Amino acid sequence: MAQETNHSQVPMLCSTGCGFYGNPRTNGMCSVCYKEHLQRQNSSNGRISPPATSVSSLSESLPVQCTDGSVPEAQSALDSTSSSMQPSPVSNQSLLSESVASSQLDSTSVDKAVPETEDVQASVSDTAQQPSEEQSKSLEKPKQKKNRCFMCRKKVGLTGFECRCGNVYCGVHRYSDVHNCSYNYKADAAEKIRKENPVVVGEKIQKI
């Protein structure tokens, strides 16, 4: 019995390598690549292409002739190119002189910069050695808070009463008439009233 084999058509990819499936009707290309191919052909037909085949045929038809006389000519050409590539001694001397001049300029600039930095360091050290008045004031010890009664020398701590005369008193001697306070309450009150209640005077009548 004859065995029948069903050959299923395997889908092939586009011949341009775009990743889509191609069609044998469009020369193995997808529809997009086939349209681009047709557009390129139409545009190339409008332009005059150079006869590349004729050039290649002429190059193949002409044999390369190499004679003994052509070898020395090539050797002389190589010698001339090598001699042109070698640097001239004049150019080397000029480069050396320029490098020496640049190094001298750098050394002089460094020498100028060194004394400037020394002056700056000296000024900074002078200012650091002279303490300012504010620092000296801040270093002073703060005054100890009085914690004893000025009259009976009883230790009051936080329960003491500070009077306007500047002393601290206990609960018994806190009144001004008890400890003979030197603060003038009357003058202070009169000054306060004078500031809060200024005298209002009307304008003088100008005679015609």
Curated annotation (Swiss-Prot):
A zinc finger (AN1-type) spans 143-189. It comes from the Eukaryota. One of its GO terms (cellular component) is cytosol. Residues 80-94 have a biased composition (Low complexity). Zn(2+) 2 binds at C149, C152, C170, H173. The modification Phosphoserine is found at S49. Zn(2+) 1 binds at C14, C18, C30, C33. It is found in: Cytoplasm. GO terms for biological process: apoptotic process; cellular response to tumor necrosis factor; negative regulation of apoptotic process; protein targeting to peroxisome; protein transport; regulation of canonical NF-kappaB signal transduction. Residues 41-68, 95-110, 120-133 have a biased composition (Polar residues). A zinc finger (A20-type) spans 8-42. Widely expressed with high level in heart, skeletal muscle, liver, kidney and placenta. The modification N6-acetyllysine is found at K204. Residues 41-140 are annotated as: Disordered. Its main location: cytoplasm. Keywords: Acetylation, Apoptosis, Cytoplasm, Metal-binding, Phosphoprotein, Protein transport, Transport, Zinc, Zinc-finger. GO terms for molecular function: DNA binding; polyubiquitin modification-dependent protein binding; zinc ion binding. The A20-type zinc finger domain mediates regulation of NF-kappa-B activity. The AN1-type zinc finger domain mediates association with TRAF2. Interacts with PKN1. Interacts with TRAF2. Interacts with mono- and polyubiquitin. Interacts with PEX6. Interacts with PEX5 (Cys-linked ubiquitinated). Involved in regulation of TNF-alpha induced NF-kappa-B activation and apoptosis. Involved in modulation of 'Lys-48'-linked polyubiquitination status of TRAF2 and decreases association of TRAF2 with RIPK1. Required for PTS1 target sequence-dependent protein import into peroxisomes and PEX5 stability; may cooperate with PEX6. In vitro involved in PEX5 export from the cytosol to peroxisomes. This is AN1-type zinc finger protein 6. It comes from Homo sapiens (Human).
